[in-house]
């Protein structure tokens, strides 16, 4: 491949190198004051090109202040937002529950902090505590309106109940969560997974199709759909779903596995970490009642 470096219309470097993704190549030139353009070509075609840009000093984001201690935050709302921030960026120095719990000291019925604690306890496998927080949050949110504008609280409680083995109740809460359009994809995906685990294949297919009308890129929907078709003996439809899904995402590991390829070929083309990838696949299949897969 040919590497060319230019600045102000002048060629600073022109050389041919052998590029290998596993071995970086270093080339040297005298750095000018002007901005540099680096172009890589092969057989007359541009493979890659990069031009330096002068930083825009006016558009630099403001420097963020360090996170305050929970006791230093003024209100329950701010504590809730601080907890969300810590949760989102996974700050190793602090856990989000410190902010949510402090928020609940200020306002024991603060719905956001209650839901934050429900999600936190769920991830920590403190399921009884998680259920308590989630139910308190829903009670608060539905004080004046039974149809709240977000399905997140119902969905979170559904996840907790399903983890506790209370599948029938979880199913009902997933359906309630799906009343809100923004929650249809995730809530009906879990509903369809439970349908499949119950061997209720027609319902699983119907609910999966509902998911796909709201989220065509949902990663679990084609898996549930293909397995349901197979269970009904409709192997051609199942194969079509798997093939279409793999055309859309050639790295979809569950669909690759269900396509029937050999185990050796499956692992030889896996770019992700095998142990974590196979664990993720196993957890998804188990949630569908597909231990045999």
Predicted feature locations:
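Long, contiguous interaction/recruitment modules in multidomain scaffold/adaptor proteins
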Residues: 1-74, 243-269
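Residue-level recognition of tetratricopeptide repeat
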Residues: 84-85, 119, 159, 193, ...
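TPR alpha-solenoid repeat register
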Residues: 113, 146-147, 153, 187, ...
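Structural marker of alpha-solenoid helical repeat scaffolds
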Residues: 106, 140-146, 180, 214, ...
